[in-house]
Amino acid sequence: TSLHQQLKALYAGDEGEQEVKLGRYRIDAVRDDLLIEEQHGGLSALRDKVRSLRRRHDVLIVKPIVARRRLIKLDREGGAEVSRRWSPKRGAATDLFDELVHFTRAFPHKRVAIESPLVEVEELRYPGHGKRRRWRENDFVVEDQRLVRVVKTVELRSRDELGSLVAGD
């Protein structure tokens, strides 16, 4: 999605590189000596990769959380805008805990940090079924997600910072 590409460019910066091959892995971005892996899905998918990379490198995991989403309905794929509205669902920094439960073998670790940008996105969707098995009335396919802005960024490097997140500091 555009969101993935935009965040990758943001974290790589002007001096960094994107899509770097390192051994058997492809790294989303490398800035100085820092390896940056962006993950929209579950963190457990990165667990073994991070455990391997952290032996020789510092690793930053970027796990975006959608704080706010504007839904833009199109009449068809690549078509004209029909309507737009805000989704009632909102994400929060504490949503990260659901993912960390499956990531304990990789984090916390002195060479691993997690950054979770809370982002506002525009999601373009059109009528259709996509690859889902179940049909529903008013089904839609997500065409793209675009970054509007980063609202806030939460950084975790240690167990203590996890505690601060729970306490709301």
Give the ranges of each region predicted by the language model:
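C-terminal, charge/polar-rich interaction regions
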Residues: 157-169
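Long, low-complexity, charged/polar intrinsically disordered regions in eukaryotic proteins
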Residues: 81-160
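Conserved catalytic cores of phosphodiester-cleaving nucleases, focusing on short active-site segments
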Residues: 27-42, 46, 53
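Short, charged, amphipathic alpha-helix that recurs within catalytic cores of restriction-modification
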Residues: 42-58, 89-104
